[in-house]
């Protein structure tokens, strides 16, 4: 089994290894997640591997348990962030993981952008333990979180209809000058 340090360094793991590490990490309460978080993907042979990076994904914003922006993206000039409504994105589709998808994302920004929070946080049991979980309002998706340290969590996205989880890391973003355009 890979260690969490190996996974963080390589940004790569099998779903089995990532879940074994997740099971060893401390579960987190909802209030631990409040704030803005910058994310990156852990390549695990999931159909979504590379997609968020190719589209300019930044991370997530947890304002409070009832108001969560699950998909924050960079603007073209990388100086601002905007929130995307996940309802519009077909999560089960296989997208090309190239610069083309990033261009398409920027062109579609006026249609995808939202000022509304589109998820919430709850304590939910996952893998026989209860942890803070982001519940999308209009998608059958749950993102479960486990604490790596005070400023990092591992996220496991459970997408209904997809057998393997999508793995990502969130790092607390307290010092960024990025403006939120929503």
Feature-to-residue mapping (PLM):
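Soluble ligand-binding/transfer domains with enclosed cavities or grooves
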Residues: 1-182
